Amino acid sequence: MRFFPKSIAVVCVLSLLITLVAPLNGIVQAASARPDKSSVGMVMSTQKIANDIGMQVLKEGGNAIDAAVAVGYALAVVHPVAGNIGGGGFAVIHTAVGENVTLDFREVAPGKATWDMYLDKDGNVIPNASVEGYLAAGVPGTVAGLSAMLNRYGSKNLATLIQPAINYAENGFNVTARQAETFNEYAPRLKKFASSKQYFLKSDGSNYKEGEVFVQKDLAKTLRLIAQKGPDAFYKGEIAELIAKDMSANGGIITKEDLAKYKPIWREPVKGTYRGYDIISMSPPSSGGTHIIQILNVLEGFDLKSMGYGSSQAVHVLAEAMRYAYADRSEFMGDPDYIKIPLKGLISKDYAAEIRSKIDLNKATPSTDVKPGQPAMHEGTNTTHYSIVDKWGNAVSITYTINDYYGSGAAVKGAGFLLNNEMDDFSIKPGVANIYGLVGGDANAIEPYKRPLSSMSPTIILKEGKLFMVVGSPGGSRIITTVQQVISNVIDYDMNIREAVDAPRVHMQWQPDELRIEKNGLVKDVVNNLTVMGYKVVTRGNMGDVNAILIDPSSGIMYGSGDPRNEF
C-alpha cells in the first residue's frame, strides 16, 4: 500500500507540489500533490478555519469527538452553504478500544406532515414546494446529535468547544472566492425571504464579495444560548420559540412540540468486507453504507487491477454494479423504524454474486431491464463531510447537511441560521424524481416523525482490526459512488489517499439511464467504447467533495486529503 506518490519524497505537511498532467489507462488525471501528513491527529474538512479549530482542540488534549463537535459548530458559521445547526446528519465513530458505533441525527418530518402535502388537488407535484421555504424543512437534528456524541465520548465541555464558532460569528471572517460565488449563485433564493436577505446579503442588497468580512450577530447569539444551556435551548427554550414563531408566520408546520420530541438515535453500523478490509458505515435511514457495500461486493468478483484503472471494462462493471444498487435503493430503502428493510440480503455476498451473473461484460444493461431484486431471499447530496483522527486512535466520520446549498433558503428570524429542505428527500410522489434525480417508492413516503432516506455515507475502514481509513463526501445522489470509488482506488489500484481523492469519478444511478463522467475524466477511446456498449455517456460537473484520512497501520502515521474539486 503506497502512502505517497512514487515520484516524490516525503516533506512537511500541507505542501502543495503539483506535477504535470498525465493519462492513466483510460483516465485523464492530473498528478496529485502529496498527502498531508501527521502523527498527532488530523482534521480534514472543506474549510480551513474549521480545520484549524479542530486541530487546536486536538493540540489542547481533546479527542476526536471533541474536535468533531467544535468543527461541526465552526462549519455552521464559516461554511453556511452546508454547515449547519438547522439540518441533520450521520456520524460513524471508531474508538481507540475498538468500539464501532453510528449516530443518526437525521431530520424528521413534522408531526403535521402528510404523504400528499406537496401535491395539488389533481395529485401533481407542486413545483418547488418541497425545496424552498418553511414548508420544505424537517425538524433539525444537528444540535442534538453533536451533544449526544459529546456526552457519550467527549472529554471537554460544550461551551469551550462552541466558543471559536461564536467568535467567528460575532467578529466575522473573510469571504473566500468560492463562498462569494455561492452567495451570488443563490442570492435569488435567499432574497425571497426577508430574514435570509438580512443575514446573507449586504444592507444595500448586494452580494458579499471575496475578502469582505461576513458577520453573523444573531447566529452568535444563538450559539451562545446553546453553549450556556445546551441543546434544550434549541429544542425547548428560546430558540425553539423563534423557530415555531417563524414557522407559524410563514406557512411552515414545525411546532414547539415537534422540536421537544426530537431525539438522535444510536444505531448499529452496517458492516461488510472487501478484499480483506472491514467496511463500517452508516445504516438506514442512510442508504449510503448499504449500497457502498453492495457495490463493492459485486466488484469483488472482478479483477479490477488486471482490467486496468479507467479502462472500458473496469468502468463498465463499475457502472453496472452501481445501476443494480440504485434500483434496489429505490424500492427497499427508508426509515427502519417505519418499514422492514432486507438489509442482510442487500449486503450479502450471495446476492452480489446473483447481480454479477446478470452483468454482460460486452454491453450495458438498459435500466428499463433492471428491476429491484429479491434481497430478502439472501437474508441470514448539498452536504459537507469531515473526517477526524486523534493521537489515541479514536476516529469520527461525519456527514451533515441542510440538503441543497443554503437549504430551503429560509432563515429563522432572530436566530440567524438557515433551515434545511430535507423534506425533498422523501418520495413526495412515488416515481417522481427529487432535486438529485433520485426516484423513490412507497418505502420512503412522508409520514409524521419519519426520517427521510439519505445517501450520506460516512465510512470507516479497518485492516485486521486496526484503523485504516476515514472517508466521506457530500454530493447528493453521487455520495455513494464517490465514496465507493475512493475506497476502490486505494484498495484495488494502490493509490495513495491524495491520488485516490483527486482521481476522476463516474456515476450511474439507474434512473436517469446515463453514465455521468466529469469533464476531461475519461479519454476519448474509452468514451467511444462505452457508447458502443450501449451507454449514454454524459459529461457533468465535479462530483463530490471528499475529505479522507488514511492511516498506516504499522506506524500510525496519518495521511490526509481534501478534494480540489470544491475548495472553500
Q: Predicted segment positions?
A:
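Active-site rim segments in enzyme catalytic domains, especially the processed small/beta chain
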Residues: V77-T102, I253-T255, A395-K463, Y493, ...
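Noncatalytic scaffold domains of N-terminal-nucleophile
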Residues: A31-D52, A64-I65, V69-K229, F234-K236, ...
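Sec-dependent signal peptide cleavage junction
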Residues: I18-A33
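Internal maturation/activation junctions in enzymes
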Residues: F302-I402, G414-A415, P430-G431
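Short, small/polar residue-rich loop motifs at catalytic or cofactor-binding pockets
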Residues: I265-W266, G380-T383, L453-M456
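Bacterial N-terminal signal peptides that target proteins for export
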Residues: M1-C12
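Extended C-terminal subregions enriched in glycine
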Residues: K450, D492-G541
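Alpha-helical support elements that line or immediately flank enzyme active sites
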Residues: V57-L58, A144-R152, K229-K236, E241, ...
